[in-house]
Amino acid sequence: MIISNLHFDINDMILDDIEKHSKSALMQDIFFKILRLSKLESHIILVGEIGSGKKRLAQIIHENSNRADGPFQSFYCVDITENDYKDAFWGQLKFGKTNIELRYDILEKAFNGIIYLDQFSELPYSYMRDILDSYLKGCTQLFRYNKTVQPRLIISLNQESYHKILGTSIWKKMLDELDPVLIMLPPLRERKEDIPVLIDHFINEIKKRSQDFKDLKISSKALFECSNYNWPGNIRQLKNAILQGAVLSYGQTIEREHLPFSMSWKLPYEFGEKKSS
Protein backbone atom coordinates (compact mmCIF):
# COMPACT_ATOMS: atom_id res chain seq x y z
CA MET A 1 0.00 0.00 0.00
CA ILE A 2 1.38 3.40 -0.98
CA ILE A 3 0.90 5.94 1.81
CA SER A 4 3.42 8.66 0.95
CA ASN A 5 0.73 10.86 -0.55
CA LEU A 6 -1.12 10.90 2.76
CA HIS A 7 1.35 13.28 4.35
CA PHE A 8 -0.59 16.48 3.90
CA ASP A 9 -0.92 19.72 5.83
CA ILE A 10 -3.61 19.79 8.51
CA ASN A 11 -4.72 23.15 7.13
CA ASP A 12 -5.62 21.53 3.80
CA MET A 13 -8.21 19.42 5.57
CA ILE A 14 -10.06 21.58 8.08
CA LEU A 15 -12.19 24.64 8.56
CA ASP A 16 -13.35 24.96 5.00
CA ASP A 17 -17.02 24.60 4.05
CA ILE A 18 -17.22 21.70 6.48
CA GLU A 19 -16.63 24.05 9.42
CA LYS A 20 -18.92 26.75 8.10
CA HIS A 21 -21.70 24.18 8.55
CA SER A 22 -20.57 23.26 12.04
CA LYS A 23 -23.22 21.79 14.31
CA SER A 24 -21.67 23.53 17.31
CA ALA A 25 -23.43 26.70 18.43
CA LEU A 26 -20.05 27.98 19.66
CA MET A 27 -18.48 27.66 16.21
CA GLN A 28 -21.53 29.02 14.42
CA ASP A 29 -21.29 32.14 16.58
CA ILE A 30 -17.56 32.47 15.85
CA PHE A 31 -18.09 32.15 12.09
CA PHE A 32 -20.85 34.75 12.21
CA LYS A 33 -18.46 37.15 13.95
CA ILE A 34 -15.58 36.32 11.61
CA LEU A 35 -17.57 36.95 8.45
CA ARG A 36 -18.53 40.38 9.76
CA LEU A 37 -15.08 41.22 11.13
CA SER A 38 -13.42 40.18 7.88
CA LYS A 39 -14.82 43.25 6.16
CA LEU A 40 -13.35 45.60 8.75
CA GLU A 41 -9.74 46.74 8.98
CA SER A 42 -9.27 45.86 12.64
CA HIS A 43 -6.29 43.81 13.70
CA ILE A 44 -7.33 40.49 15.25
CA ILE A 45 -6.01 38.30 18.06
CA LEU A 46 -6.99 34.61 17.93
CA VAL A 47 -6.71 32.70 21.19
CA GLY A 48 -7.00 28.92 21.40
CA GLU A 49 -5.33 25.70 22.38
CA ILE A 50 -2.72 24.06 20.16
CA GLY A 51 -4.34 22.35 17.19
CA SER A 52 -7.65 24.22 17.47
CA GLY A 53 -7.49 25.66 13.95
CA LYS A 54 -6.27 29.23 14.50
CA LYS A 55 -4.28 29.42 11.26
CA ARG A 56 -7.17 28.22 9.12
CA LEU A 57 -9.47 30.76 10.76
CA ALA A 58 -6.93 33.46 9.92
CA GLN A 59 -6.98 32.28 6.29
CA ILE A 60 -10.78 32.38 6.24
CA ILE A 61 -10.67 35.97 7.53
CA HIS A 62 -8.27 36.81 4.70
CA GLU A 63 -10.39 35.03 2.06
CA ASN A 64 -13.52 36.93 3.11
CA SER A 65 -11.88 40.33 3.62
CA ASN A 66 -11.43 43.29 1.31
CA ARG A 67 -7.77 42.21 1.18
CA ALA A 68 -8.51 38.79 -0.35
CA ASP A 69 -6.59 39.67 -3.53
CA GLY A 70 -3.53 40.56 -1.46
CA PRO A 71 -0.96 38.16 0.02
CA PHE A 72 -1.38 36.11 3.19
CA GLN A 73 2.07 36.10 4.82
CA SER A 74 2.46 33.65 7.68
CA PHE A 75 5.36 34.08 10.11
CA TYR A 76 5.92 31.10 12.44
CA CYS A 77 7.21 32.45 15.74
CA VAL A 78 8.34 29.24 17.47
CA ASP A 79 12.10 28.73 17.88
CA ILE A 80 13.08 31.78 15.84
CA THR A 81 16.31 33.61 16.53
CA GLU A 82 16.82 37.32 16.96
CA ASN A 83 18.30 37.47 13.46
CA ASP A 84 15.23 35.71 12.01
CA TYR A 85 12.75 38.31 13.13
CA LYS A 86 15.09 41.22 12.52
CA ASP A 87 15.59 40.10 8.91
CA ALA A 88 11.83 39.86 8.47
CA PHE A 89 10.65 42.99 10.27
CA TRP A 90 13.48 45.47 10.65
CA GLY A 91 14.28 47.90 7.89
CA GLN A 92 17.35 47.05 5.81
CA LEU A 93 19.20 49.39 3.50
CA LYS A 94 19.55 47.80 0.06
CA PHE A 95 22.27 49.26 -2.14
CA GLY A 96 21.42 49.21 -5.84
CA LYS A 97 23.51 50.38 -8.77
CA THR A 98 21.96 53.82 -8.80
CA ASN A 99 20.21 54.24 -5.46
CA ILE A 100 19.76 53.13 -1.87
CA GLU A 101 16.40 51.75 -0.77
CA LEU A 102 14.91 51.03 2.64
CA ARG A 103 13.34 47.57 2.49
CA TYR A 104 11.11 45.75 4.97
CA ASP A 105 10.99 42.10 3.93
CA ILE A 106 7.74 40.74 5.36
CA LEU A 107 5.89 44.07 5.32
CA GLU A 108 6.52 44.53 1.62
CA LYS A 109 5.75 40.90 0.80
CA ALA A 110 2.43 41.28 2.59
CA PHE A 111 1.91 44.70 0.95
CA ASN A 112 -1.77 45.45 1.63
CA GLY A 113 -2.66 41.88 2.51
CA ILE A 114 -2.41 40.16 5.88
CA ILE A 115 0.48 39.14 8.12
CA TYR A 116 -0.32 36.18 10.34
CA LEU A 117 1.93 35.93 13.40
CA ASP A 118 1.59 32.23 14.20
CA GLN A 119 2.05 31.37 17.91
CA PHE A 120 3.20 34.90 18.69
CA SER A 121 2.85 34.19 22.41
CA GLU A 122 5.75 31.70 22.27
CA LEU A 123 8.25 34.53 21.71
CA PRO A 124 10.20 36.22 24.50
CA TYR A 125 8.54 39.49 25.50
CA SER A 126 11.46 41.50 24.11
CA TYR A 127 10.96 39.91 20.67
CA MET A 128 7.21 40.62 20.78
CA ARG A 129 7.87 44.25 21.60
CA ASP A 130 10.46 44.62 18.84
CA ILE A 131 8.17 43.07 16.22
CA LEU A 132 5.25 45.33 17.14
CA ASP A 133 7.52 48.39 17.07
CA SER A 134 9.04 47.33 13.75
CA TYR A 135 5.61 46.79 12.20
CA LEU A 136 4.37 50.24 13.21
CA LYS A 137 7.63 52.01 12.38
CA GLY A 138 8.04 50.15 9.10
CA CYS A 139 4.62 51.11 7.76
CA THR A 140 5.33 54.76 8.60
CA GLN A 141 8.82 54.80 7.07
CA LEU A 142 7.75 53.04 3.89
CA PHE A 143 5.02 55.64 3.44
CA ARG A 144 7.72 58.30 3.54
CA TYR A 145 9.44 56.44 0.70
CA ASN A 146 6.20 56.71 -1.30
CA LYS A 147 5.32 53.07 -0.60
CA THR A 148 1.81 52.68 0.73
CA VAL A 149 2.21 49.46 2.69
CA GLN A 150 -0.27 48.72 5.46
CA PRO A 151 -0.78 44.99 6.01
CA ARG A 152 -3.38 43.90 8.53
CA LEU A 153 -2.16 41.85 11.49
CA ILE A 154 -3.71 38.64 12.77
CA ILE A 155 -1.95 37.33 15.86
CA SER A 156 -2.42 33.86 17.34
CA LEU A 157 -1.89 33.15 21.03
CA ASN A 158 -1.95 29.75 22.69
CA GLN A 159 -4.46 29.51 25.52
CA GLU A 160 -1.88 28.96 28.27
CA SER A 161 0.42 31.74 27.07
CA TYR A 162 -2.52 34.11 26.72
CA HIS A 163 -3.29 33.82 30.43
CA LYS A 164 0.38 34.44 31.24
CA ILE A 165 0.61 37.71 29.32
CA LEU A 166 -2.70 39.17 30.50
CA GLY A 167 -1.98 42.33 32.47
CA THR A 168 1.65 42.54 31.37
CA SER A 169 3.22 45.52 29.64
CA ILE A 170 3.34 43.68 26.30
CA TRP A 171 -0.39 42.94 26.51
CA LYS A 172 -1.09 46.62 27.22
CA LYS A 173 1.11 47.56 24.27
CA MET A 174 -0.83 45.26 21.95
CA LEU A 175 -4.15 46.72 23.10
CA ASP A 176 -3.00 50.35 23.00
CA GLU A 177 -1.16 50.29 19.67
CA LEU A 178 -3.16 47.77 17.66
CA ASP A 179 -6.65 48.14 19.20
CA PRO A 180 -7.37 44.53 18.19
CA VAL A 181 -10.52 42.42 18.21
CA LEU A 182 -10.17 39.32 20.42
CA ILE A 183 -11.62 35.97 19.28
CA MET A 184 -11.55 32.94 21.60
CA LEU A 185 -11.62 29.53 19.90
CA PRO A 186 -13.23 26.67 21.84
CA PRO A 187 -11.29 23.41 22.24
CA LEU A 188 -12.67 20.35 20.47
CA ARG A 189 -13.87 18.84 23.77
CA GLU A 190 -16.34 21.74 24.08
CA ARG A 191 -17.80 21.10 20.63
CA LYS A 192 -18.05 17.33 20.52
CA GLU A 193 -21.06 17.42 18.21
CA ASP A 194 -18.58 18.40 15.47
CA ILE A 195 -16.34 15.35 15.93
CA PRO A 196 -18.36 13.00 13.63
CA VAL A 197 -18.56 15.77 11.01
CA LEU A 198 -14.79 16.29 11.10
CA ILE A 199 -14.08 12.56 10.99
CA ASP A 200 -16.29 12.17 7.93
CA HIS A 201 -14.45 15.07 6.30
CA PHE A 202 -11.02 13.61 7.08
CA ILE A 203 -12.01 10.20 5.71
CA ASN A 204 -13.27 11.79 2.49
CA GLU A 205 -10.01 13.75 2.17
CA ILE A 206 -7.97 10.56 2.62
CA LYS A 207 -10.06 8.79 -0.03
CA LYS A 208 -9.32 11.59 -2.49
CA ARG A 209 -5.58 11.15 -2.06
CA SER A 210 -5.28 7.43 -2.79
CA GLN A 211 -7.32 4.69 -4.43
CA ASP A 212 -5.95 2.37 -1.73
CA PHE A 213 -8.39 4.03 0.68
CA LYS A 214 -11.50 4.18 -1.50
CA ASP A 215 -13.37 1.82 0.88
CA LEU A 216 -12.27 3.57 4.07
CA LYS A 217 -14.86 4.03 6.81
CA ILE A 218 -15.04 4.02 10.61
CA SER A 219 -16.87 1.55 12.83
CA SER A 220 -19.56 2.66 15.28
CA LYS A 221 -17.38 1.61 18.23
CA ALA A 222 -14.39 3.61 16.99
CA LEU A 223 -16.64 6.60 16.31
CA PHE A 224 -18.05 6.32 19.84
CA GLU A 225 -14.52 6.28 21.28
CA CYS A 226 -13.55 9.35 19.24
CA SER A 227 -16.72 11.21 20.23
CA ASN A 228 -16.07 10.63 23.93
CA TYR A 229 -12.36 11.41 24.03
CA ASN A 230 -11.16 14.81 25.30
CA TRP A 231 -8.67 15.50 22.46
CA PRO A 232 -6.02 17.61 24.25
CA GLY A 233 -4.38 18.14 20.85
CA ASN A 234 -7.71 19.23 19.37
CA ILE A 235 -8.42 19.03 15.62
CA ARG A 236 -4.82 18.26 14.70
CA GLN A 237 -4.76 15.28 17.05
CA LEU A 238 -8.09 14.02 15.69
CA LYS A 239 -6.78 14.23 12.13
CA ASN A 240 -3.64 12.32 13.06
CA ALA A 241 -5.70 9.63 14.83
CA ILE A 242 -7.88 9.10 11.75
CA LEU A 243 -4.80 9.05 9.52
CA GLN A 244 -3.22 6.38 11.72
CA GLY A 245 -6.45 4.40 11.71
CA ALA A 246 -6.63 4.57 7.92
CA VAL A 247 -3.14 3.11 7.57
CA LEU A 248 -3.50 0.40 10.23
CA SER A 249 -6.86 -0.72 8.84
CA TYR A 250 -5.32 -1.05 5.35
CA GLY A 251 -7.90 1.37 4.00
CA GLN A 252 -10.89 -0.65 5.17
CA THR A 253 -12.83 -0.09 8.41
CA ILE A 254 -11.17 1.86 11.23
CA GLU A 255 -11.78 -0.09 14.44
CA ARG A 256 -11.02 0.88 18.03
CA GLU A 257 -7.75 -1.06 17.99
CA HIS A 258 -6.53 1.02 15.05
CA LEU A 259 -6.77 4.26 17.05
CA PRO A 260 -3.79 5.58 19.06
CA PHE A 261 -3.28 3.60 22.26
CA SER A 262 -3.02 6.84 24.26
CA MET A 263 -6.73 7.54 23.75
CA SER A 264 -8.03 4.07 24.58
CA TRP A 265 -9.21 2.67 27.91
CA LYS A 266 -8.14 -0.82 26.81
CA LEU A 267 -5.22 -2.64 28.41
CA PRO A 268 -2.32 -3.78 26.19
CA TYR A 269 -3.27 -7.49 26.36
CA GLU A 270 -6.72 -6.67 24.99
CA PHE A 271 -5.09 -5.67 21.69
CA GLY A 272 -4.06 -9.22 21.00
CA GLU A 273 -1.25 -9.64 23.49
CA LYS A 274 -1.51 -12.43 26.00
CA LYS A 275 -2.02 -11.40 29.59
CA SER A 276 1.02 -12.25 31.67
CA SER A 277 0.43 -14.72 34.48
Question: What are these model-predicted stretches?
Answer:
Residues 2-17, 23-28, 32-39, 49, ...:
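Nucleotide-binding/hydrolysis machinery
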Residues 21, 75, 138:
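ATP-binding "lid"/motif region of the histidine kinase catalytic
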Residues 33-97, 108-122, 187-192, 241:
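Conserved post-Walker A coupling segment in P-loop NTPases
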Residues 95-101, 135-141, 164:
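Short gly/ser/thr-rich secondary-structure transition/capping motifs
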Residues 114, 120, 133, 153-154:
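Hydrophobic helix-rich structural segments at or within alpha/beta enzyme and signaling domains
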Residues 121, 136, 179:
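Short acidic-aromatic loop segments in the C-terminal HATPase_c
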Residues 128-136:
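Conserved Walker B catalytic segment
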Residues 271-277:
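Short, intrinsically disordered, charge-balanced linker/junction segments flanking boundaries
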